[in-house]
Amino acid sequence: MINAPLHARQTLDLAGFRPQADARPVEWLISEAPVPYPDAVAAMESRAAAIAAGDAAELVWLLEHPPLYTSGTSGQSTDLLDPRFPLHTTGRGGQLTYHGPGQRVAYVMLDLKRRRPDVRAYVAALEQWIIATLDAFNVRGERRENRVGVWVARPDKGADHEDKIAAIGVRLKRWVSLHGIAINVEPDLSHFTAIVPCGISDPRYGVTSLVDLGLPVTMADADIALRAAFTEIFGATVDAPQVDPAVDAGARSPA
């Protein structure tokens, strides 16, 4: 049974995720080259600790990874069917997923103590961020209560068929968020066949991307839409003032 959808034009109670009046804007950083997963996690955890201590601004870090799989806290080894790429065990919630070129990963480091300390509502806010981003390309993304992430209906594939276009996995440490979202812009979708994505084996539920849906969307297009939608839900952003050596030598502030 498919749950009632929530799409971009419906309203969620997300007002609590906007920052306090005296908060600094969220810094926005983009890495051009693929970032190795262990390096990204180490940098993310370092920045999150600085945010919790009040020594750094909140940060959204956009990047791509080289091809790899990650297993969250609910991951099952049986969901790795054909290990083609390295597998990394990680502290985020969720199960097994794929990351690689053509997929936009956004690591979101927000201080929820100063926003809204509610993990379920935070995940819903991330889903709504993705849904609003997809809406910029006239793609109707939907959320499901029993399937975290964002889905698109695929009647062309059969009745009740849906494909996942974006995944979510989060962790909180001292109420600062780690990890975040991954939107499929133009990844190699065949790489998902080596796993049971997010533990969902029902053949009605697959994986798609913006390009797979027939849209000529570039990563730069996706980044612009992500930033605009983020601002509506989480508040103002500002280009990172300089490359942060704790993040990545290949990172840049948006032009």
Swiss-Prot record:
Q: Where is the BPL/LPL catalytic domain?
A: 54-238
Q: What is its EC number?
A: 2.3.1.181
Instruction: Specify the domain of life of the species encoding this protein.
Output: Bacteria
The positions annotated for binding substrate are R92, G93, G94, Q95, L96, T97, Y98, H99, A167, I168, G169, G180, I181, A182
Asked whether the UniProt record includes ATP-binding among its keywords, one would answer no
Any one annotated GO CC term: cytoplasm
The enzyme class is transferase
Chief place where the protein resides: cytoplasm
The answer to whether keyword Cytoplasm applies is yes
Protein name in UniProt: Octanoyltransferase
From what organism does this protein derive? Rhodopseudomonas palustris (strain HaA2)
